[in-house]
Amino acid sequence: MDWVYAIVYGIVEGITEFLPISSTGHLILTGNLMGVPWSKEVKDAFEVVIQGGAILSVLVYYWRDFLKIRHLGHDRSQQTLWTGVLVATIPAVVLGLAFGDQIQAVLFKPSVVAWALIVGGVLMWLIESRRVQPQVHAIETIGVRRSLLIGVLQCLALVWPGFSRSASSILGGMALGLDRPTATKFSFYLGVPTLGGAALLNLVKERELIFGEIGLLNVVLGAGVSFVVAYLAIGWLLKFVSTNNFKGFAVYRVAVGVLILVLIATGVMSNGSLA
């Protein structure tokens, strides 16, 4: 059955990693509803692997854009863009290295994730209800100040598991004047160093568990499925935000958060620490 769990986890991760709906919340639901028999350590390690597959999909989807880094020395727009990405990554790196373990130990509970989904959904609805014209329409013109603020806001997902890194960076960008497509694309870019770095670090630390207990076949299967599904999700989301707002996602987040709370209240799901 492990290969079935690998495929399902890969699908869930691929769909939810870049949509503003919290991959954490959905992986919790998936594991509980399917009764996945893996230990907490195995689940954590496997989620890191399949997250790597999702991150790789961004590099492949935007491979032409990433190749422009070659012109960094003389292309001012590329200098501005990648300086912004670097600056926006710093807050999460500092916070994660300093307090990552403590945050997981104290806050990583299903009820905390559920409320993060609900509150994030409400904020998403409120931001989408503003009558404000966006000022930034290209990621090359975001600038260092806005990038840093988006990076700080992205940390909300780190200190409040379930809020969603994608949601915090996209909503933060929109609140700072980016239009939806630009905020969404910048969130994709920002995920590469933020999530990619975390995935590599955990892969090195947990390599024996990942390849020993999970098995190479399941690792390749889960990461491969995550890559393909995430690639499709990126294309779909970019097309969606060009003509639609995020209010539907806001309602969905609240519904999933309420569902988790109901499952906890009825004893179907334990509210014990996930760390």
From Swiss-Prot:
<keyword id="KW-0133">Cell shape</keyword>
<feature type="transmembrane region" description="Helical">
    <location>
        <begin position="214"/>
        <end position="234"/>
    </location>
</feature>
<feature type="transmembrane region" description="Helical">
    <location>
        <begin position="1"/>
        <end position="21"/>
    </location>
</feature>
<feature type="transmembrane region" description="Helical">
    <location>
        <begin position="184"/>
        <end position="204"/>
    </location>
</feature>
<dbReference type="GO" id="GO:0009252">
    <property type="term" value="P:peptidoglycan biosynthetic process"/>
</dbReference>
<dbReference type="GO" id="GO:0008360">
    <property type="term" value="P:regulation of cell shape"/>
</dbReference>
<dbReference type="GO" id="GO:0050380">
    <property type="term" value="F:undecaprenyl-diphosphatase activity"/>
</dbReference>
<dbReference type="GO" id="GO:0005886">
    <property type="term" value="C:plasma membrane"/>
</dbReference>
<keyword id="KW-0961">Cell wall biogenesis/degradation</keyword>
<dbReference type="InterPro" id="IPR003824">
    <property type="entry name" value="UppP"/>
</dbReference>
<feature type="transmembrane region" description="Helical">
    <location>
        <begin position="42"/>
        <end position="62"/>
    </location>
</feature>
<keyword id="KW-0472">Membrane</keyword>
<dbReference type="GO" id="GO:0071555">
    <property type="term" value="P:cell wall organization"/>
</dbReference>
<comment type="function">
    <text>Catalyzes the dephosphorylation of undecaprenyl diphosphate (UPP). Confers resistance to bacitracin.</text>
</comment>
<feature type="transmembrane region" description="Helical">
    <location>
        <begin position="80"/>
        <end position="100"/>
    </location>
</feature>
<keyword id="KW-1003">Cell membrane</keyword>
<dbReference type="GO" id="GO:0046677">
    <property type="term" value="P:response to antibiotic"/>
</dbReference>
<keyword id="KW-0573">Peptidoglycan synthesis</keyword>
<feature type="transmembrane region" description="Helical">
    <location>
        <begin position="147"/>
        <end position="167"/>
    </location>
</feature>
<keyword id="KW-1133">Transmembrane helix</keyword>
<keyword id="KW-0378">Hydrolase</keyword>
<feature type="transmembrane region" description="Helical">
    <location>
        <begin position="249"/>
        <end position="269"/>
    </location>
</feature>
<keyword id="KW-0046">Antibiotic resistance</keyword>
<comment type="similarity">
    <text>Belongs to the UppP family.</text>
</comment>
<protein>
    <recommendedName>
        <fullName>Undecaprenyl-diphosphatase</fullName>
        <ecNumber>3.6.1.27</ecNumber>
    </recommendedName>
</protein>
<keyword id="KW-0812">Transmembrane</keyword>
<dbReference type="Pfam" id="PF02673">
    <property type="entry name" value="BacA"/>
</dbReference>
<feature type="transmembrane region" description="Helical">
    <location>
        <begin position="107"/>
        <end position="127"/>
    </location>
</feature>
